[in-house]
Amino acid sequence: MSQTPSSPVPRGGGPSRLFILRPVATTLLMIAILLAGLVAYRALPVSALPQVDYPTIQVVTLYPGASPDVTASAITAPLERQFGQMSGLQQMSSQSSGGASVITLQFQLSLALDVAEQEVQAAINAATNLLPNDLPYPPIYSKVNPADPPILTLAVVSDALSLPQVEDLVETRISQKIAQVGGVGLVTLAGGQRPAVRVRLNGAAAAAYGLSSETIRSAIANANVNSPKGSLDGPTRAITLNANDQLRSAQEYQNLIVAYRSGAPVYLRDIASVEQGAENTQLAAWANNHPAIVINVQRQPGANVIATADAVLAQLPQLRESLPASVKISVLNDRTQTIRASVSDVRHELLLAVALVVMVIYLFLRNLPATLIPGVAVPLSLIGTFAAMYFLGFSINNLTLMALTIATGFVVDDAIVVIENIERHLENGDPPLRAALKGAGEIGFTIISLTFSLIAVLIPLLFMGDIIGRLFREFAVTLAVAILISAVVSLTLTPMMCARLLSQESLRRQNRFSLACERQFQRLIAGYGRALRLALRHPRITLGVAVATLMLTVLLYLIIPKGFFPQQDNSLIQGTVYAPQSISFSAMAERQRQLSEALLRDPDVASVSAFVGVDGVNPALNSGRLQIVLKPLADRRDRIDRIIPRLQALAARVGGISLYLQPVQDMTIDTLPGRARYPFTLQAMSLDELQTWVPRLQARLAQSPMLKDVNSDWQDQGLVAYVNVNRDSASRLGIAMQDVDNALYNAFGQRLISTIYTQSNQYRVVLEQERAHQDGLTALQRIYLTAADGSAIPLASIATVEQRHGVLAINHLDQFPSATLSFNVPDGYTLEQAIAEIDAARRAIGMPADMTLHFQGAALAFQSALDSTLWLILAAIVAMYIVLGILYESFIHPITILSTLPSAGVGALLALMISGQALDVIAIIGIILLIGIVKKNAIMMIDFALAAERTQGMAPHDAIYQACLLRFRPILMTTMAALLGALPLMFSQGVGAELRQPLGICMVGGLIVSQILTLFTTPVIYLAFDRLARNTHRPTRGVPAR
């Protein structure tokens, strides 16, 4: 029954009074929050994780035919010197291989990517004069992290057209359109077969005519030009000049006259074969074991994956229409599918958590009107949070949805506390309005203290450093906003609805089930009362249990295995293939094709794309890349951790290769794609030091059971033909070293000697020795040089050739020579143990002090997170102590409240150990949240005890005993609500479940143990501090949190 209009309005109500007395205004305010949240929800972007990336730029310079030494000294070093002067540069790594220089620049998180781009462009401009004059392509930079897997992989094939023709269509009609899409950072063509005219020189035939390869190169270059010719400007007309100065086809080049001998023309066809082919014949790609042009689309750092991929996919129908009917485009991999599936799973878990929480409320209250009130408050608080997320620039992702799922148990707590207190006054005979005002007035500041002390726990998360801190900022802020909105709803809508929906009649109206539940609950309260009296009579035992819990928490923290992030199953695997270092391209291509064919036999594999050849990603001819797309999780027999060993067993049947596989993760911290999950870099002053110590360290680590798949990118057994020119002999013949270099480059470097210009694209003319004359060292015997008198001189007459071993790639870290090793952690061991083992191995082999070891990517982030873990937890405790001390005006009572924390720590750590989980970053977040949850029990007890002492003059013993019994029901309800809110995360099985399970396990384990212990330890500690204060003659009574 509500108050009649003529009845005087009761006093009280605290901050809720206005909202209780103005139900229409309160209802409209809540509707506004609801609508704002719904509108924001539809506008929020979707992603796997918060968009947090280091500003990263990759600079690629191609120099076909150059050795790693030449690439490093002529291209990489000049560029590095300029890049090293840029402000905000955090790390610079480079890889100089045969024909390609790749420099990766990682900037500080605080630097905007556009600013970094301007600095890079300026540095490239400054280095231009220092680069080789015959460099066929200028340095090209891309706003992309090379370690970030493609968001889309497309395959383009044709039964009617050759691959060079398909490549030309892709370059002119597809790749440029995709690159124009907002958020796309880089579009690469794997297996690129750009059309070109290939001139394959017959050295012996040219020498017979007395022609050197340099003479032929000059003749071709001079015969194909595209330069301005001016115009004629007469009295009445203007005429533009043009000429047939370009040769556009292989046929035209065959008929090119390169010289005259005895008055007769020497055609190019007489001394070379000329054909229409590919610019680089040492590149190949396959899509599901069929030759193809594979398009990899990578996003810019910070770009939304789903928005970018959707924009690209939306263009595919139009792009297909622009291609001939024989050219087919297929999507091999779409990363958004697993991201959408993962987010969808978390949404379902969120809805399940809400349903479980409402069910718990009904079981405790056994009253539909009373259940309806928190049933409205929970979704309203969660939906309202979306509005704040939109204005803060957040996205709907795994972490923000996890925060909302956990918040389900938090936000209902406030409503439960308010409803339970108002019901108590109704049972005591107060009419609904009076009960609402009195109950809300009594509990209002308790709600405020609960809210601010819980938000205080989240404050340290906002100050976590580096990329991990940025990652969890959205999680912490989303959870804090949900808690804050919940407090507002509980102080406004909840008491207003109680005044209108609850009545003494509704409380008395109970069925048999309700009566049976109530009897059982009364027995439970009575049993708790007896156990509590026993604990209060034997305080030393209870205090001993509390101290033992604290000690056990410390012990468990020290011994529990520690990790970084759980390994996710995103249905995508990246593979790196390595063969013997001296393998030829054709042999490597055949093994890669065989491997692709073998992997496709696995029933859980949906598609395989494979690539070999040297480009901006692949460092050497003996390496290749794989991208393996698995079937959706629901359609597979096994999860990814079981599939990988199976695929490696299939690869073992293909002889002469090593295959390294690692699952693609949502969070990419590395800057270079590696063979294993955890990389570290050895940096030295010279390549000789690396040659000595890298194999030793790798061999030592390979023997350790704490690491597996130990490997390095150090390759120094490639075959090198060292041409030792007798300079004296060459000088007598009038042959310069430049002539020798040009002859070798013209023969074996796939030298780009001229450019064919068209309206839509540019094509190159490639000069090389005939393929049959490139089969070994004997090919050098067919090289001729032109002496000063015009005679043809064999290279062998002035030079000797020595076969040596050399490096296939030269790597730098911050301009110093380096080698990167990487490893995986076997089951039963942790990343913490593996890192300790690496440090021990380094000391054991006696590595010099001037060689430095730098952990990279995930290993580096783990070390940073591990170092800050204890400080993070301590900061959360200190923040909570300060807030509670201010609210209670006491130095003692916050300590009583914080004494509940060790029990939560024991429960969380034990749960992790029992389930076989490591204490990783996600689990640490769970422990920090537990700090905020479990202290609610103590706050509700102490707040009521202090109020009883102050207003009723009760003794501390009687006050805390009464407070424990009065608050037992809401304590049990709130704990069960939080526990069931975390339960869906604990038992999560969908895509990306590995990321969510540790959080749920921590929450459930910590809540169960803390619920059992704190009901007894908190009142005992409260009385112990009271006695201590009385014995020291200090005032003990703080004030309730008002």
Curated annotation (Swiss-Prot):
One of the record's GO molecular function terms: xenobiotic transmembrane transporter activity
Pfam families attached to this UniProt entry: ACR_tran (PF00873)
InterPro entries assigned: AcrB_DN_DC_subdom (IPR027463), Acrflvin-R (IPR001036), Multidrug-R_MdtB (IPR022831)
Mode of membrane association: Multi-pass membrane protein
Transmembrane segments: 19-39, 350-370, 372-392, 399-419, 443-463, 475-495, 541-561, 872-892, 893-913, 914-934, 971-991, 1001-1021
GO CC terms in record: plasma membrane
Keywords per UniProt: Cell inner membrane, Cell membrane, Membrane, Transmembrane, Transmembrane helix, Transport
Main location group: membrane
Cellular localisation: Cell inner membrane
Recorded family membership: Belongs to the resistance-nodulation-cell division (RND) (TC 2.A.6) family. MdtB subfamily.
Subunit structure: Part of a tripartite efflux system composed of MdtA, MdtB and MdtC. MdtB forms a heteromultimer with MdtC.
Protein's UniProt name: Multidrug resistance protein MdtB
Protein's organism: Edwardsiella piscicida
Primary gene name: mdtB
